[in-house]
A protein has these predicted regions:
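N-terminal glycine-rich FAD/FM-binding segment characteristic of electron-transfer flavoproteins
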Residues: 1-180
Length: 180
């Protein structure tokens, strides 16, 4: 199992999107996440990468990922990855993350993503936020978002100036939005 010791977070660069495929076809959630990932990558000035695992994935689908913003696509082609298995996909994805070190990893809130995401987070000793409705790394853009979606007095609230990912999701049955 992968393990981090005294992690140097400065070594982590880039935004990644796990691109789901079924029967060789990349799923629509992948394109949606790439579009969001592109915004984050632009704000951070880093590369956006798509990660596809499977076997015999249609090459046209892989090429299309660039049209949705991916600067690079990692395609792990192995017959053992043709159909999703929790342990197989988690091992391959975690190994790739340990090797390449992206700072942000986006995984869709699908059945597959809800299985894979927590397992990878646990193996990599990192956090996970599910069901996000807004993502931001730019504090000014985040303040603008809050002005239009909340009652927070943004101008009189102190915000730490950093590029940490701010993840907004529903809380308390959807009656409140929480940013993590």
């Amino acid at each position: 199992m992968a393990e981090f010791n005294a992690m140097d977070t400065a070594a982590f660069k880039g935004v990644w999107v796990f691109c789901e495929q079924r029967e060789g076809q990349v799923q629509a959630i992948s394109y949606q996440l790439l579009s969001e990932g592109r915004k984050l990558a632009n704000d951070l000035g880093v590369e956006l990468c798509g990660v596809v695992m499977g076997s015999e994935v249609n090459e046209d689908y892989l090429k299309a990922l660039g049209g949705y913003g991916a600067d690079r696509v990692y395609y792990i082609d192995n017959p053992l990855l043709k159909d999703y298995t929790t342990d197989g996909y988690a091992k391959v994805l975690c190994d790739l993350i340990m090797e390449k070190k992206p700072e942000i990893m986006l995984i869709g809130a699908t059945n597959l993503g809800r299985d894979l995401g927590p397992r990878c987070a646990a193996r990599l000793h990192t956090g996970l936020t599910a069901d996000c409705t807004h993502l931001d790394v730019d504090v000014a853009k985040y303040k603008d978002f809050l002005r239009t979606t909340s009652n927070i007095d943004v101008d009189n609230t102190k915000f730490e100036e950093n590029t940490n990912l701010k993840m907004t999701r529903p809380a308390f049955g959807g009656h409140l939005m929480a940013t993590i």
